Structures are given as structure tokens and as C-alpha cells.
């Protein structure tokens, strides 16, 4: 049995509950009484239902800087052990789910975990600055069993969209999300990469203090405009505009949340597979490129909406 440790919890992120539940199931009484996320209280009973999704792996330990949070996660996700430190957690497990998306704390909290050599999942992206990203690159390298992802890329909606778009002429793509660019851009970018590849030549953020409006220019002429504003209502997702056809809406947070939950389950299955085989589901180069596109969006906004040419931006990053 593969033993997994989970690290949580930051404000606005319920992944320690939902990711752990894929492996362990959940206690519905504690879920309804103690979980602070209404959507999780809805989709776990409706679409997980305490079925077994992964038979040969369990979350056996949890750590959170706030003891009360760790205890709550443990009760809801049936985790038998609460670690008193990251070191205690990492020593007791075979692999680590780092389920925090306060990206500015990623290196400070998780950097030491890479010394263990154990498989690691990092929520969404690695870093919020080029300096921290370089630290992760130096600590991990292309052969480390590392997965960073949003589950949108693993949603059944993406496979449906691939089939639907196979005979279409795509004109442009629009993406909408709540929250902030550095945290939620990976949701939209991961799905874009699956559908249209990652050959992005320029990034421009024309947003303002209220949010981000980021245009991604593909080498083939495709443009994707991603709008991320805190407080925007659901659904989060992409809309693909086609020549002579109705737009195709691809919802991450679909109306019933069934496909949303299934995307999480599939992502955890692929993490489990990486732990066993050592083979990452996403190439190292793509993991780093996605993070650098996030950084380019930040850089563009800081420079008043300047168009960032990715070739020169990547050269500067590598210097």
C-alpha cells in the first residue's frame, strides 16, 4: 500500500479535503459539520459517495501549521495520523501531496521536501517569482518525480471538447475565472495546453487593480484571452469561438460538479501512477513553461500592459 502525506491548508483552498477523500473516502457527518467549503460538502456525497477510486494508496498522515486545521482534515478525510512537522510527515510516507495554493509560500514551505527524493504533487504551479522558480528547478530537475497541476486538464470536459473541436476552425478562445492570476491562471492554462498546445509566443496583461485580462498569442495566430477577477461567479471555464458554428463552452465547474469531481479523481490517479512508475504525466519542460507564462503575465502587468515576447523572456529567465 502506497502511503501518502498531505500538507494543507490555506485560505480559500479545500484541496486537502477533496484530494485526500479520493484515496480515503470521507466521514460525511464531520464533512457537513466542519468543512468550510460548501461545494465540497455538495460534490463529495453526490459524486464520490464513498466509492473506492484508488485501491492501493491511502493518505496516512496530514500536516498543517495550524493544528486545528490538521485535526479537521484528519476527521473529514479519515486520516489516521497528524504530524507535528513537515519532517515528521515526510519521514512517515512514500509520497507527498502539497495541497496549498498560496504560491508565495511554496518554496519556503516545500523546498526542503525535495531533499527526500520522494514523489511530490505541488498545487497548480511551483512559484510566484523567477527567483523561487529557479530554486525549484535547481532542487528538482527534469528527472524528479514531480507533478504540478490543476485538475481542469484532467476533466472529462476536455476530452469531450477535443472530439467536438476536431472538425472546427477555431477563431479565438476566452477564459474566465475568479480569484487572482497567480493562483487561478493554472486552471485555464492547463486546459488550454491540452486543447491547443503550448506554443505561445507572446503574453500581454492589460488588467487593472480589479483583475487581470491576459492575451496569449500562439505562433499559429490563435489568441486566447483569459480574464481573472476576484469574486466572479461560477462557472469557471473556457469558451471556444468557431467559424460558422456556435461557441463551445467548456466548464471546469460544471452545473452538477460531477465532471469537476471526476477531474480531481483522475488527477489523483495519475499522481498515484507517477509514484509507482516514476514517470511524470506532464513533461518537465511544460511544467516550467506554464509557470513562466504565469510569471510573464505578472511581469506584463507590472510594466503597464507591455507585450512580453516569450523568446526573450525565457532567455532572461535562463540567464
Residue ranges and their predicted role:
Residues 14, 106-107, 156:
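Glycine/Thr-rich phosphate-binding loops of Rossmann-like dinucleotide-binding domains
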Residues 171-235, 285-292:
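Rossmann-like dinucleotide-binding domain that binds NAD(P)(H)
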Residues 1-72, 152:
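N-terminal Rossmann-like dinucleotide-binding module
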Residues 117, 143, 304-305:
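Glycine-centered short loops/turns at secondary-structure junctions
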Amino acid at each position: 500500500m502506497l502511503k501518502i502525506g498531505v500538507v494543507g491548508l490555506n485560505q480559500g483552498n479545500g484541496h486537502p479535503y477533496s484530494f485526500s477523500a479520493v484515496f480515503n473516502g470521507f466521514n460525511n457527518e464531520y464533512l457537513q459539520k466542519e468543512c468550510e467549503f460548501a461545494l465540497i460538502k455538495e460534490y463529495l456525497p453526490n459524486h464520490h459517495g464513498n466509492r473506492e477510486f484508488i485501491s492501493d494508496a491511502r493518505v496516512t498522515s496530514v500536516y498543517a501549521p495550524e493544528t486545528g486545521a490538521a485535526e479537521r482534515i484528519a476527521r473529514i478525510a479519515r486520516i489516521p495520523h497528524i504530524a507535528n512537522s513537515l519532517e515528521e510527515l515526510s519521514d512517515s510516507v512514500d509520497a507527498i501531496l502539497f495541497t496549498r495554493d498560496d504560491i508565495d509560500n511554496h518554496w519556503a514551505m516545500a523546498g526542503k521536501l525535495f531533499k527526500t527524493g520522494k514523489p511530490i504533487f505541488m498545487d497548480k504551479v511551483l512559484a510566484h517569482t523567477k527567483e523561487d522558480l529557479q530554486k525549484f528547478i535547481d532542487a528538482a530537475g527534469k528527472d524528479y518525480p514531480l507533478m504540478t497541476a490543476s485538475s481542469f486538464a484532467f476533466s472529462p470536459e476536455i476530452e469531450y471538447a477535443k472530439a467536438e473541436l476536431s472538425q472546427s476552425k477555431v477563431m479565438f478562445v476566452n477564459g474566465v475565472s475568479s480569484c487572482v492570476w497567480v493562483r487561478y491562471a493554472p486552471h485555464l492554462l492547463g486546459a488550454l495546453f491540452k486543447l491547443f498546445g503550448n506554443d505561445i509566443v507572446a503574453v500581454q496583461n492589460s488588467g487593472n487593480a480589479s483583475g487581470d485580462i491576459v492575451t496569449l498569442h500562439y505562433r499559429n495566430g490563435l489568441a486566447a484571452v483569459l480574464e481573472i477577477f476576484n469574486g466572479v461567479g461560477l462557472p469557471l471555464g473556457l469558451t471556444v469561438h468557431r467559424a460558422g458554428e456556435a461557441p463551445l463552452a467548456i466548464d471546469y465547474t460544471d452545473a452538477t460538479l460531477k465532471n469537476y469531481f471526476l477531474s480531481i479523481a483522475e488527477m489523483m490517479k495519475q499522481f498515484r501512477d507517477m509514484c509507482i512508475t516514476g514517470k511524470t504525466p506532464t513533461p518537465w519542460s511544460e511544467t516550467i513553461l506554464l509557470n513562466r507564462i504565469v510569471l510573464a503575465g505578472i511581469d506584463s502587468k507590472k510594466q503597464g500592459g507591455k507585450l512580453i515576447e516569450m523568446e526573450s523572456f525565457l532567455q532572461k529567465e535562463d540567464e
